[in-house]
Structures are given as structure tokens and as C-alpha cells.
């Protein structure tokens, strides 16, 4: 008996020292995490308190947003860091980096009629370009798509197949004065050229309706366009927040992430406060348990400007360190008001774009979560248009959830998920209306429980999960022009 008490005393003394990278206080006495137990720790009131905090952070600043490098995002980063650090369960760090911020506005008129346009971020500025409009063929991704008389004219290009940046570059190579990209699905179009490039020309976005109307007008006669683009640029310091459980096998890391920044236009409570708070809620709930595999949470910066934070992080890891990450889970927009329960198509069965080995199994796990409760779900395009992109480019298995952005809900989807047909999943996407009032409480609660379900499964065991592919480079650029949603900003950021 004496020896048992001595052993216990030694164990408690060791735990109380709180050695960094070792198990936190009380670890041996915590129950092993299970899917049911972790899900039961998820409370809607905690989720809503989190999104309301992000709203208050945005409201505290005149810009009313949480765009990277701005005061709203700086406060977001500090709050997340302090909340997770205070648990004592994680080793937490802020990963500093500098990225180029851009803000752009555009006006476009055709034959004297004003159109509702948005400028692509990182677009070169333009002061009252007046030129004839011509149409590019085949989505404008190749030099042969541009008419011989493109020089000095503004070119109209349909979205799809290649990135906005590539379209702008091809237009520049054809010596166009500017480019207008119109959507290939209903709704307006906002995005980014992905960075500065001397090949780019001033570039704006239009809705599918306005773009098709212009194409029809050109077919029947001359269309003169006036285009203005105002662009601002600034190098900004910003941070990822990375938190890893002190306990668990650090050579078998389960990683999940969500971007913590918003667009300039608003507070970004669904995009992506919902994902940020979803994983934070799970991170806090996980502190009640011990686990076998370490879990690493990430809150990414600057997703809205081209997946910059997650790409910076992945590029900071050599192959040996990245190989410790056995899978990556991404959660971006999980509380859309007119939601659909969507799972990244890791096996490629719906969109013919497969992820690295293990991505299919992640998809099947989320399918099981919904199926076991009799809840409908559907695949969403696994195209690399969110923060998982940098991971799958290095051959890390990935998956995740998404409840929809600007794509319009169909009558068939209404039968599955309820809501309103003919209305976007999130009509306030990338707008000032993306506030707490924009959150569907049922969707965010359900999807946060799904996050908990997946974390508990993989933190407990990777038994049956495919052997981690060798870390390397992998092409994930899709070649689909009509592919519906695949995430938030990434759906319109690049393509």
C-alpha cells in the first residue's frame, strides 16, 4: 500500500510540474475520448457565445470587419490564442508572417448603362478605360481563346477552368486594356487575382446574368464599355494560431483548421466565424479527455486573399515534420442560413477529383455521422479551393464540411435540407450582412458535433486508416468549368 501511494505521489508531482510538450495536469485520470462523450460536451450556447464574441470584436472597430492585418483580425487572433492557452491543455503559438493586402473597387458601364461590378483584389488600377468589348472563347485560359483584334479592347471572359489570375494574364498577353470575368452560376462574382503580376490587366467581376446579357449584345452589335478600378496595396503583419495537445502521440498528429479572417465587406460570422468557433468549441470540449493521438488545431490567417496563412504554414514544414500530420480536416462556413449538409468529395465519385489516399475514408466517416442519424447529405467539390489545398498538394489526406456560399439552392435540395429554392445558401456571403443574425443555429450545432465526432474517432485510433502517403508534391488544379461550390472564399477566390 505504501509503495502504491508513493507511486501516485510521484505521478501527481510530475503532472503538476506542467512540462511543456508533456501531458497536462490530471491527464492520467481523464477518461479516454469517445465520439459520444465528446459530442455530448458540445453545447449550442457555447457556440453562439463564440460567434457573438467575434461579432463584438468586429463591431468595436470602425471598419466593422476582421480582415487580416486589420485591428478586428488582430483582436480575433489574440482572443483565440488566449482562450486556448488558458485551458492549459495545449501548446499554443502564434505564427507571424507578412502578406500583401489589397482592396479594390470597380465601376463598369456598357453602352451607357451602369452594371453592378466588383474588382478582383490585386487588380491593377484603371482610370476610366473606354474601349470596345470583345468576347474570349472557351473560358479564356489559352492564347488561342482571344480574338485577333483584342489589343486595346476590354475582353469579356466566362468564369471556369482556370484561375482568375490566369485569365487576367492571358488577357494581358493579348494586349487587352482590361478584362471582365462573369460568373458561371447565378449570382454576383467577387474574387482575387491571387497576387501582383505584371501580366495582369485591370480586372472586374460581373454576375452571370449581366455577363450573358453583354455576350448577347456583342453578338448583335458593338458594345462600348467604361471601366474604373481603384486598387490599394499594403504589406501587413498577421498570424496563424496553432495549438497542439500536450498529450498524445506527436508522431501521429490529427490536424484540423478553419480560417479566422473575414473579407473587407463585413464581420464574416458565417465565413468563417462559424468554422473558427466550431473548432474552438471542440478544442475546449476535448480538454475533458485523454487521447492516443495528438490533435493540432489551426486558425488560419488571410484565407480570403488566397489561402495565404495555411500555405505559409505548410511551406514552413519539411517533409519529415509534415509526415507526422496523418490527416487534415477543414471547416469553412458551417452555419449557412439556407444550408445544405455537404462533405468534401474525397473519393472523387461525384466530381472525379480525388484526394490523397485516406481522403475517401474521411468522407466516409462524415457520411456515417449523418447516416447514423438519418440526416441527408451531399458531396461538394474537392478542388483545393480552401485551406486544405496546401495539404493535399503535399499529399496529406484531407476532408471536411461545408454548408454553402453563393450558389443557389435547388428545389431538389429543398426536399433534402429544407430552406428556400432559388436563394443562395448564404445570401450574405462576402457581404456586410454576414452577422450573427446570418447564422443557422441548427446547421452550426450539427456540424460542430460532426467535428467532434471526427476528432474523437481519429484522436482515439487510426486503425483501418490507410497508411499515410509519402509527403511530396501533387497537382490539385481542377479542370472543371461548371463545378458548384467547394468552400467559401476559395470558391470565388481563384476560379
Curated annotation (Swiss-Prot):
Residues 1-21 form the signal peptide. It holds the Pfam family Peptidase_M28. Zn(2+) 1 binds at residues 259, 271, 332. It comes from the Eukaryota. Its cofactor is Zn(2+). The record marks 429 as: Transition state stabilizer. Glycans are attached at residues 142, 235, 272, 352. Residues 130-216 form the PA domain. Binds 2 Zn(2+) ions per subunit. Transmembrane segments: none annotated. Keywords: Aminopeptidase, Glycoprotein, Hydrolase, Metal-binding, Metalloprotease, Protease, Secreted, Signal, Virulence, Zinc. GO terms for biological process: proteolysis. It is an enzyme of class 3 (hydrolase). Zn(2+) 2 binds at residues 271, 304, 430. GO terms for molecular function: aminopeptidase activity; metal ion binding; metalloexopeptidase activity. Monomer. Extracellular aminopeptidase that releases a wide variety of amino acids from natural peptides and contributes to pathogenicity. PANTHER family: METALLOPEPTIDASE M28 FAMILY MEMBER, PEPTIDE HYDROLASE. This is Probable leucine aminopeptidase 2. It comes from Trichophyton verrucosum (strain HKI 0517). The gene is LAP2.
Amino acid at each position: 500500500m505504501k509503495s502504491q501511494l508513493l507511486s501516485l505521489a510521484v505521478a501527481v508531482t510530475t503532472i503538476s510540474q506542467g512540462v511543456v510538450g508533456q501531458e497536462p495536469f490530471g491527464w492520467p485520470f481523464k477518461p479516454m475520448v469517445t465520439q459520444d462523450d465528446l459530442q455530448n460536451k458540445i453545447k449550442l450556447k457555447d457556440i453562439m457565445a463564440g460567434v457573438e464574441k467575434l461579432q463584438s470584436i468586429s463591431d468595436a472597430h470602425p471598419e466593422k470587419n476582421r480582415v487580416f492585418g486589420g485591428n478586428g483580425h488582430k483582436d480575433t487572433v489574440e482572443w483565440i490564442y488566449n482562450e486556448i492557452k488558458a485551458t492549459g491543455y495545449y501548446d499554443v503559438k502564434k505564427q507571424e508572417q507578412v502578406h500583401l493586402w489589397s482592396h479594390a473597387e470597380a465601376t463598369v458601364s456598357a453602352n451607357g448603362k451602369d452594371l453592378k461590378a466588383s474588382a478582383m483584389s490585386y487588380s491593377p488600377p484603371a482610370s476610366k478605360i473606354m474601349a470596345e468589348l470583345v468576347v474570349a472563347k472557351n473560358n479564356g485560359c489559352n492564347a488561342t481563346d482571344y480574338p485577333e483584334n483584342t489589343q486595346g479592347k476590354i475582353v469579356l471572359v466566362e468564369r471556369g477552368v482556370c484561375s482568375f489570375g490566369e485569365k487576367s494574364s492571358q488577357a494581358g498577353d493579348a494586349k487587352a486594356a482590361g478584362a471582365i470575368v462573369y460568373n458561371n452560376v447565378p449570382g454576383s462574382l467577387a474574387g482575387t487575382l491571387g497576387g501582383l503580376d505584371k501580366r495582369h490587366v485591370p480586372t472586374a467581376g460581373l454576375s452571370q446574368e449581366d455577363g450573358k446579357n453583354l455576350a448577347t449584345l456583342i453578338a448583335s452589335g458593338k458594345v462600348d464599355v467604361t471601366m474604373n478600378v481603384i486598387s490599394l496595396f499594403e504589406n501587413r503583419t498577421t498570424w496563424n494560431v496553432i495549438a497542439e495537445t500536450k498529450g498524445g502521440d506527436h508522431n501521429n498528429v490529427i490536424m484540423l483548421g478553419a480560417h479566422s479572417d473575414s473579407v473587407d465587406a463585413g464581420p464574416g460570422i458565417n465565413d468563417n466565424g462559424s468554422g473558427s468557433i466550431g473548432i474552438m468549441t471542440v478544442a475546449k470540449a476535448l480538454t475533458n479527455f485523454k487521447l492516443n493521438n495528438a490533435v493540432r488545431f489551426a486558425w488560419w490567417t488571410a484565407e480570403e486573399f488566397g489561402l495565404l496563412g495555411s500555405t505559409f504554414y505548410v511551406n514552413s514544414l519539411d517533409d519529415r515534420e509534415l509526415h507526422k500530420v496523418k490527416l487534415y480536416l477543414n471547416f469553412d462556413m458551417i452555419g449557412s442560413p439556407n444550408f445544405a449538409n455537404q462533405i468534401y468529395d474525397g473519393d472523387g465519385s461525384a466530381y472525379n477529383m480525388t484526394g490523397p489516399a485516406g481522403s475517401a475514408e474521411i468522407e466516409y466517416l462524415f457520411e456515417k455521422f449523418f447516416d447514423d442519424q438519418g440526416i441527408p447529405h451531399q458531396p461538394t467539390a474537392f478542388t483545393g479551393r480552401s485551406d486544405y489545398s496546401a495539404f493535399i498538394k503535399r499529399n496529406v489526406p484531407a476532408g471536411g464540411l461545408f454548408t454553402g456560399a453563393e450558389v443557389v439552392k435547388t428545389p431538389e435540395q429543398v426536399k433534402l435540407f429544407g430552406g428556400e429554392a432559388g436563394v443562395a445558401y448564404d445570401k450574405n456571403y462576402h457581404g456586410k450582412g454576414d452577422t450573427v443574425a446570418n447564422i443557422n443555429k441548427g446547421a452550426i450545432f450539427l456540424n460542430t458535433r460532426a467535428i467532434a465526432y471526427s476528432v474523437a474517432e481519429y484522436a482515439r485510433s487510426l486503425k483501418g486508416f490507410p497508411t499515410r502517403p509519402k509527403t511530396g508534391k501533387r497537382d490539385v488544379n481542377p479542370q472543371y468549368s461548371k463545378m458548384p461550390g467547394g468552400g467559401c472564399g476559395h470558391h470565388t477566390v481563384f476560379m
